[in-house]
Amino acid sequence: MTVGIPLAILDRPEGKHDIILQFSGVQWTIYIDGRLYDNDFALGYPLASRMKLWSLNPDYVSEANLYEPAIQPEQIAAPTPQIASNIQYWTPPYHNAWVGDVVTFFHDGRYHVFYLFDRRGHASKFGRGGHYFEHLSTTDFQTWVEHKPATPLEYQWETFGTGTPFLFNGKLCISYGLHTTRIYPKEETTLPMQWTYLEKNGYTGSFNYDTIQGLVPAGSTYSISEDGVTNFKKTHILYHPCENPSIYTDPDGNLKMLANYGARGTWKADSVNGGWKCLDADFPLGGDCTFFFRWGEYDYIIGGFTRLWSKLAKDPEFAYKDVVVEGTDFYNGLSVPAITEIPGGRFLMAGWLKMQNWGGPLVIHELIQYPDGRIGTKWMDEIIPATGTPKKLSAKLTGTGDFPVSSKSFMLTFKVYPDQPRQGNLKVLFLPEKGEESACEWQLQLDKARAQYGTNLTATYASSEKTLREGGAPQTASNYAIENGIDTSKPFMVRILVDGSDKFGGSLIDTEIAAQRTMISYRPELTVGNLRFCMEGISVQDISLAPLSD
């Protein structure tokens, strides 16, 4: 196991630095000049028999000491906020630290974001993930608070999977899965015992894993907030053998759960602490994390990376239809999106954008709903990144136009005017300063109400990418297409936000089309230096570019 950082990320790489490497029994943590920079979670302990000799290079190390017991860190307030006022595209401010699966909840005037803290793209803890829930919240979407971890890792056998926040008996709770089978064989965990109980009784049992001898805890558990905001305490109760439990209270007040990873189906209970009975063994399908929400006259279940179902709220449970098969889903490049209602009848979708194997920046978009229940997406006004003074690039453009870009992070806006309703094509090429090696093409086909990200190194339009219905993979945040839900019969606005950073190792491109659909992509190794517009059957007007504010 290696714990460390590139010295170049320090504010002052040269000169003398005080370095502390601490082992807590659960994790190794490296502190440099009093600040935490990296950690990883242990499996096993250092062998004293192999630690008799230390090799230190005096050209780099002037003094070294071993402390037993270990020096204990003391947490102090940071001199500057660690969370920017704008949360969009945020990542934890540490080396190789990312947002993993996101679950959200609105309670008592506060929007909560719980996210699996990810380092190394799921490669921490020797590839077992080492995930746990960190916690952010806001009351106004402008000021964000970073709370203590909701589910810290306290034992070497712990590594957690996704669940959901929910209310039970008036208390804020969060369910999550113990992904212990990534470390131990299933036979050495509590899962066989839990499945046996379920098969014998027809409902799940309730087990306090502190009282179980000889088996490692696995399955579903939950934590309870002691103050309704933060300060979560683990219950140590195992209540179901699934390892990604999505608990929610339905609109009729019933406690339900969608079982994922290791189980499937819809379940119901009177209490979180066991007694869960299966209502439908085959739906949802399990696997990815699933979330239920009701919006007006419609019920929806969104399932992880690629699944979405809906039905009229008045219809029975078996009436859910596959929205993806119909081609009317609203997946837009995010992974494992979670949906939450906020005041004003608004719904937010939060997820992570794939930049690592299992992590990236946090992204929040707002949903829109049509009378037939179809859902689209748009940017959320309150969290659009601030920009500097916009510069008009062109009042009107037909054919082709090229424009240099001086800022690697910017917002591009323009209006599309079709010559004929629902006719025409447009592409915008995002080019590096020199050459076309890492270029990205965003393309819009008005006749098909279809848009895509693609790779184009030619003068023509890139070949068609696949939508989710067609077998495409929007969740990769690379090349993909979206279809339907865009009204191209009249002029409309397009806004594109490009965020390039050294940490990203490239650029994020987030596009909003007519405030009806959004799509987002990550382009590694691309720093945009030039823009190229090409179009047929349309004109583009009021092209403006504004740099993002620091």
Language-model region placement:
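Carbohydrate-active catalytic/glycan-binding domains of CAZyme proteins
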Residues: 4-18, 24-31, 35-550
